[in-house]
């Protein structure tokens, strides 16, 4: 990595102060009309041409519109956005569009290279910086100053959800046997990858990461976690594993305060769904929604 991106303290040289002329007591640059729309607790997001949908490149990406929504709502131009599980650069693209600085991290070098190459293909913005770093999220504190991050936003690996052969049970009939059928699409086989862990181990490791991120976040800075519940098929009739509740409990034990829960309505992204559980085991389609958990770092007492 080029030395010029680091300062004399070996931290990333990146601005984190707002560059807009908005009043300092405003949370962001958003106007009242947009604020009103953002108060709706159920939100839809749509994929665009720039989004990565090929699961051979990355098994699970959220739309650029999702981080864009929160970056626009919770930060000013020039402020710093952090994604500890950056994947192929979705959050970086959103930050570039909105004139925010952003740093993301990922364990997998292929994802990091892909993300940074995506940025190079865009028109440069001389006033902001966006970069993805190849390192463990546990080490993020080595790269950034305390009280420098205005927003943390991410979609972490959902424990070992992808670490099994894909059966596409939520798809209809013959549509189940698509190009991804019977394939394992996990993020990596790195033992440090949260996507290889059982649920309780996943929650503990996620908490360890967010405890280290806590000093980096400014007071009243927000942290958004996109999470879904899991379904355990190892027992008769299956059982729901409430990952969102476990995440809330862990985050609050660290010191984060839950502010909002937004439902990501994914029905516009789910097509040709199949039937399962009928006629004696009612199970909701987990693919139709996810939880967007909004925490902040409260003011010191």
Question: What kind of region is each of these model predictions?
Answer:
Residues 1-301:
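Class I S-adenosyl-L-methionine-dependent methyltransferase catalytic core
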